[in-house]
Amino acid sequence: MLSSTKTQGKNLMRLPVAAALVLAGVALFAGTATAQTGYVGILGGGPVYKNDDKTNIKELKTAGFTELLVWSVEVNASGDLNLNGEFPLTSGGKYIGDQTWPKFAKALKNIKTGKVTRITLSIGSSNVGDFQNIKALVDSQGTGKKSILYKDFAAIAKALPIDAIDFDDENSYDEESTVQFALMLGGLGYHVTMNPYTNNTYWTSTVSAINTQMPGLVDGIHLQTFAGGQGNSPCSSEWDFGDVPVFPGLSDQPGAPPFKTPTAAEAQLKTWHSQCGITGAWLWIFDQIAGTDQVKEYAKDMTKGVNGE
């Protein structure tokens, strides 16, 4: 995906941890992939948390979108999490987001009292480093309860109403560490989604490996069909993830072509629904249309499109 506003375990010693997470998570996630009915989502950055007047929160709560993707979480070399390089979320495995934006947790909870039923935290972007750091941390510490990644996401789970973690890896593509990281998240109660734009063989293999060990953990694919993903189709065989539904992402931003108006988005989604029965989609990016009537227009028209109306 476009850059943010600031522009495999390696040995057998990890197997007991992975196995424990699988045993803990299978009952939780079994069958959820086929039960997935789809979401119409919107991805947003700074405007989701920089909101003293509550206008953006009200828009997101009432517009009609059913999923909010909060983007982009950066993972530094020590394992600390930060939104867009300007909003520290964790330090040393403890949640510190309330020090910068104390109303963030309350705002997300408020959003979920409206139309939004799922909040997803998206990691990565076109920036190099996030998933390389995750790989290094998994290699050095594993994913057990004493690891920094486990502590980070346990702290996030306690502080914020996050349902899923989205993997927007655009340059690391290490299957082994990604699988271990995903299984850890599943053990903590999260679902996992993927956010690809290229390298389909990596993504299909990784999703298969994850869901083989913890069925239903990966329950959606946020496929980019704009910018670097221009030309991608959720109906293409190269993006076939079996029982895991593919939700195409459309762009409201002229700088991330092809730009789609609400009406054009509806038409495109209706075509894909007719071709392969898509049940969901998502919009890049809330930041472009925050404070305008287009938020509701996109939600309404995209919902009609994925329903084939």
Q: What is each of the regions a protein language model found here?
A:
Residues Q36-E266, Q275-I278, F286-G308:
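Chitinase-like catalytic core of GlcNAc-active glycosidases
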Residues Q268-K270:
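Short glycine-rich, acidic/polar surface loops and turns
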Residues R14-A18:
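Fungal secretory targeting signals
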Residues A19-L28:
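Bacterial N-terminal signal peptides
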Residues F29-A35:
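Sec/Tat signal peptide C-region and signal peptidase I cleavage site
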Residues M1-M13:
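N-terminal secretory signal peptides that target proteins for export/translocation
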